[in-house]
């Protein structure tokens, strides 16, 4: 499920800094033992992002497992104001709830829609780590690897992904268009190199393969993509395509 908090008025403050502050605020609302448990997880069962609109600032919290929903949902629902260190207290205008259940993902996978092109909008700085180094330009392999890992661990309870499937997806997908820029995400005193923008790719192969890609990407709108999605990195959305 997705939990979206809409803060009244627009906060004139950098979204990346707000995302880290909001994450700290969220952790303060939870039991310390549960926070320790979350820090030990290989893949965090939640993701957050901050989106600056013209009229308001949205703090979006994605709860990705039943366990964290049980622990966090009511806490989020009861928040009336937010204190972020040195910033003025913020009033919560409304809480919007969107759901993405297993039945919806299965419906996407079983759909007869034969979509070939997919466009990803990277709303917040997105990055990967490969062989110990930061990667500031996406490859189809890194995109699918991240989505498959998050989906496998959080939905299917599978710690490892199928390398053959990853190879097949990567070999049958080609980037056709992109408009990306380097973007740094600051966590405390560390500047993490990343990217933002838009990327379009084509999938060649059976309809089932394309449906699997659509399912992974739809899940990715909730799970985030790449590293540090719990802190606000890797927020993505799919652009609706008519082809």
Can you annotate each of these PLM segments?
Residues 1-243:
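RNA-interacting cores
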């Amino acid at each position: 499920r997705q939990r979206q908090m809409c803060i009244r008025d627009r906060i004139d403050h950098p979204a990346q800094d707000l995302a880290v502050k909001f994450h700290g605020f969220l952790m303060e609302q939870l039991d310390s033992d549960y926070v320790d448990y979350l820090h030990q997880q290989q893949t965090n069962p939640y993701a957050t992002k901050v989106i600056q609109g013209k009229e308001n600032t949205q703090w979006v919290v994605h709860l990705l497992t039943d366990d964290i929903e049980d622990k966090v949902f009511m806490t989020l629902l009861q928040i009336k104001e937010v204190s972020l260190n040195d910033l003025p207290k913020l009033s919560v205008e409304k809480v919007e709830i969107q759901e993405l259940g297993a039945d919806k993902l299965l419906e996407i996978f079983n759909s007869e829609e034969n979509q070939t092109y997919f466009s990803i909008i990277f709303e917040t700085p997105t990055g990967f780590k490969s062989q110990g180094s930061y990667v500031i330009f996406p490859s189809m392999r890194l995109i699918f690897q991240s989505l498959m890992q998050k989906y496998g661990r959080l939905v299917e309870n599978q710690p490892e992904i199928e390398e053959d499937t990853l190879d097949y997806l990567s070999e049958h997908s080609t980037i056709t268009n992109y408009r990306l820029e380097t973007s740094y995400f600051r966590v405390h005193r560390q500047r993490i190199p990343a990217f933002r923008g838009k990327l379009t790719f084509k999938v060649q192969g059976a309809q089932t393969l394309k449906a699997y890609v659509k399912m992974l990407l739809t899940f990715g709108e909730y799970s985030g993509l790449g590293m540090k999605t719990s802190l606000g990195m890797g927020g993505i959305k799919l652009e609706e395509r008519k082809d």
